Amino acid sequence: MFERLEFSFEKERQFTSDVSHELRTPVAVIISQCEYLLENENLSAEDKEEIAVILRQAKRMSKLTSEMLMIARNEQDEQHLMEKLDFGLLSELVIEELQTKAQEKNIEITLQKQDDLFMNGDQTLILRMMMNLITNAINYGKTNGHIHVILKVENDQIVGEVKDDGIGISEEHLDRIWERFYRIDKSRSRENGGTGLGLSMVRWIVNLHNGTIHVESIEDIGTSFIFRFPKI
């Protein structure tokens, strides 16, 4: 019986991986064509808005397939490239990439970091973790708000915090935000392009690197994600 279950789970994982991989190319084509069409000055404002909606949803689908593929690969016990990483530098790169998105809501992102923030890790996954945390802070942050990223060394650990002054999370939802596809506000998630996988992936990445993460939040005040990794 257990062998049949394991076979079934393996087939499910393989199916998820295959579907996610096959979706990437057509979704990329849709994104490319939408961006091309939006450059056409002869389109009406109504046409451009409709194309923009398609583009937003296509980008959301692209993010979803990428995250599903990453999760499927993890469940297949794929090897990860562990190397010496400068966590501070990687965080700077993520913040730089997300500045345009933050500016759309006039959100200021500040980074406060100590030196010597080195750890062993998979660079792609650590970048994804920080991307998800800061993107989440932007999506649920208030217009004209602030996001503070704080990185320090404490007891041979890298301690990081991503703190926003956004809408916050009610206590009833705090324990469930790590679940796959769990969304507190589905309409807001769709509007922001959320997939429901971001925080689930964050926790998996943290656990993979022998770290810990927890969340502190007060409704209408803001949210802080605090994580720790072994330092080298």
What are these regions (language model features)?
Residues 83-84, 103, 108-118:
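Conserved catalytic submotifs in the C-terminal HATPase_c
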Residues 53-61:
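Short alpha-helical segment of the dimerization/phosphotransfer core of two-component systems
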Residues 144-156:
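Short beta-strand/loop element within the Bergerat-fold HATPase_c
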Residues 169-183:
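Short conserved segment of the HATPase_c
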Residues 137-138:
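Short helix-loop "hinge" at the ATP-lid/N-box region of the Bergerat-fold HATPase_c
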Residues 43, 76-83, 118-121:
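Conserved micro-motifs of the catalytic ATP-binding
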Residues 210-211:
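Conserved glycine-rich
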